[in-house]
Amino acid sequence: MRSRLRPATPPPVVVIPPMPTPPMGAPLEMRVPAKAEDGTRQTVNYGISTSQTIWNFRSAYNVAALNCVEVQFTPILEGYKRFLKVYDKSLDRASKEIDASFRTQHSGRAAIVARETYQTQVYNFFSLPPVDSSFCQAAMEVSAELNTVEPSQFDNWSYTGLAKLEAPFKAFFDAYDQYRADLAAWQSRYGSNGLITVRPNAEQVMAQPVVQPQASVPQAQ
């Protein structure tokens, strides 16, 4: 008498969540500035002098004036023009001090090239496409705040201004680090392509029919 086999319990349904994606439409792979031991992001603005802070603020504001061209950001360009006039003495002094600093490290033409190379890095830093919108909004706020900063106060305020323009980029880098951590965890659990293998459990193994070997039948000679 043939015994009845219980139907095997189907394997559990595994719902795979969407694979994490980069923030703000960023590339799947990109390098972001590392963090120092104290958690400070080591960007091009990390550990710089007051004169370099002033000049990096100028560079960042210049990028905003050129790139934030939507109608709602019109005050940025007007604010930048005012900035160049009102704080011209601080800017001139900072530029001369920066030149002198590079000349202590390089000689002749090499000092000019070194400064231009560094400054290109600064411009590129503030031109990161995924951060455009939040950067322009920060530049709007800085433009309004500059109206209250006296020329005699600008050198000290430049640290505040640069930090505000840099903040959207630091937030993006933090978000990108989180994306990479989330992606690594997702791939560890679901595989690089989201394909997983569900192995049968003990109940399913026991419920499988046992295949009996068939006896061989002698063939007629």
Named regions from a protein language model:
Residues 1-15:
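Bacterial Sec signal peptide processing site at the extreme N-terminus
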Residues 15-46, 52:
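Post-signal-peptide N-terminal segment of Sec-exported extracytoplasmic proteins
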Residues 41-55, 78, 82-85:
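Short, solvent-exposed segments of well-ordered alpha helices
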Residues 47-70:
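Alpha-helical bundle segments that constitute or directly flank the non-heme di-iron/ferroxidase center
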Residues 68-132:
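Mid-length scaffold segments of soluble, non-membrane domains
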Residues 108-200:
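A charged, amphipathic interaction segment
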Residues 197-221:
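Short, low-complexity, Pro/Ser/Thr/Gly-rich segments in the mature regions of secreted, periplasmic
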